[in-house]
């Protein structure tokens, strides 16, 4: 008997190419699942892994990013681009204020950044700037935690933080630099229509490539768990309210104690309830056989004593369940 159960990968091979590169191979998948899971993992790896990046910088003697600094080979734009290439990792906190102070001829690298024991510089040899004799570079760097790519103008800035010389940076928080996947044919026994998924990943060194894939898989599982526990949201059904009707209107016209002549004239026109009566106009009643002006005045006076008049409009009349008299 053929089983309808979906295959799950039984072979997972992790090949470490370098400290920042790895190739992960998984098989077998049912046909089509290689692309489904490969694309989902790739998008999560590129967009949803947390990381740290410089977000603001203040440089002594510099008012804006289009300035130059005496004694430094790079202009400020190039300096900021180099600064964005510094890979950092904060331990036990989500943001930090770092300092860099260097003077004299030489190369300024990420190693010159000072921030404390819980700030790890992943690429300390990364070049930030070159100073000439007599050159000096002093700056404060704010590092924050985030996800994906966040333009500087997308982050709200409070009024007290809008100071002259404060430069806001576009931040690329993702620790993953490159991800690609390939789906190949796989075979299990007599089945040859299966998928083999191969993922190549490169990080910036702040996270291990294998751990990055595990994290992305957990994110995907967490998001899909909502569908696994899918339940319809109960919608409260509010019963339709029947418009309330004055009980007086449900009483028969006999309760008005009209003269026999007037009462008989109304019943001849199928007017059995007070609610029927008040919806008629004077003109309509005067057309009733044997009902003259005297009877009309009598009806108007009796209705007025109960706060009612002729020609009134009633919605939902007659109400459901009203017994027909006659």
Swiss-Prot record:
Enzyme class: transferase
Leader sequence segment: none
GO cellular component, one term: cytoplasm
EC number: 2.7.7.6
CDD domains linked to this entry: RNAP_alpha_NTD
Top-rank taxon: Bacteria
Subunit: Homodimer. The RNAP catalytic core consists of 2 alpha, 1 beta, 1 beta' and 1 omega subunit. When a sigma factor is associated with the core the holoenzyme is formed, which can initiate transcription.
Name listed for the protein in its UniProt record: DNA-directed RNA polymerase subunit alpha
């Amino acid at each position: 008997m053929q089983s309808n159960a979906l295959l799950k990968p039984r072979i997972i091979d992790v090949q470490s190419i370098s400290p920042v590169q790895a190739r992960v191979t998984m098989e077998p998948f049912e046909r089509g699942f290689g692309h489904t899971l490969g694309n989902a993992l790739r998008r999560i790896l590129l967009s949803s892994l947390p990381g740290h990046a410089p977000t603001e910088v203040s440089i002594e003697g510099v008012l804006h990013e289009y300035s130059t600094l005496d004694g430094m080979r790079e202009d400020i734009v190039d300096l900021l681009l180099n600064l964005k290439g510094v890979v950092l990792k904060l331990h036990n906190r989500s943001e930090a204020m770092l300092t860099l102070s260097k003077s004299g001829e030489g190369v300024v690298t990420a190693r010159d950044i000072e921030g404390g024991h819980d700030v790890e510089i992943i690429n300390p040899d990364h070049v930030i700037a070159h100073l000439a004799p007599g050159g000096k570079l002093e700056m404060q760097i704010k590092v924050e935690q985030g996800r994906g790519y966040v333009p500087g103008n997308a982050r709200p800035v409070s009024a007290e933080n809008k100071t002259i010389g404060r430069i806001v940076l576009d931040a690329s928080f993702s620790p993953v630099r490159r991800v690609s996947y390939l789906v190949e044919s796989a075979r299990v026994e007599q089945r040859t229509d299966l998928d083999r998924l191969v993922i190549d990943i490169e990080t910036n060194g702040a996270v291990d490539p294998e751990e990055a894939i595990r994290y992305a898989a957990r994110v995907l599982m967490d998001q899909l768990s909502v569908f696994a526990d899918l339940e319809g949201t109960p919608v409260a059904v509010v019963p339709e309210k029947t418009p309330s009707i004055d009980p007086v209107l449900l009483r028969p016209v006999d309760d008005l104690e009209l003269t026999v002549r007037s009462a008989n004239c109304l019943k001849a026109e199928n007017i059995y309830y007070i609610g029927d009566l008040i919806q008629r106009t004077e003109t309509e009643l005067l057309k009733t056989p044997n009902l003259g002006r005297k009877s009309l005045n009598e009806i108007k006076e009796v209705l007025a004593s109960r706060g009612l008049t002729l020609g009134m409009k009633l919605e939902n009349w007659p109400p459901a369940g009203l017994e027909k008299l006659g």
